[in-house]
Amino acid sequence: QTSFTPRL
């Protein structure tokens, strides 16, 4: 599972 979650 590859999930990209951008964090500020």
UniProtKB/Swiss-Prot annotation:
GO biological process: neuropeptide signaling pathway
Compartments, as annotated in UniProt: Secreted
Main location: secreted
Residue list for modification Leucine amide: 8
Pyrrolidone carboxylic acid found at: 1
Gene Ontology cellular component list: extracellular region
Disulfide bond entries: none
PROSITE patterns named in the record: PYROKININ
UniProt record similarity statement: Belongs to the pyrokinin family.
Record's miscellaneous remark: An analog without the N-terminal PCA residue was synthesized and found to exhibit greater activity (144%) than the parent neuropeptide. The portion of the sequence of LPK most critical for the myotropic properties is limited to the pentapeptide fragment FTPRL.
Its job: Mediates visceral muscle contractile activity (myotropic activity).
Protein name listed in UniProt: Leukopyrokinin
Organism for this UniProt entry: Rhyparobia maderae (Madeira cockroach)
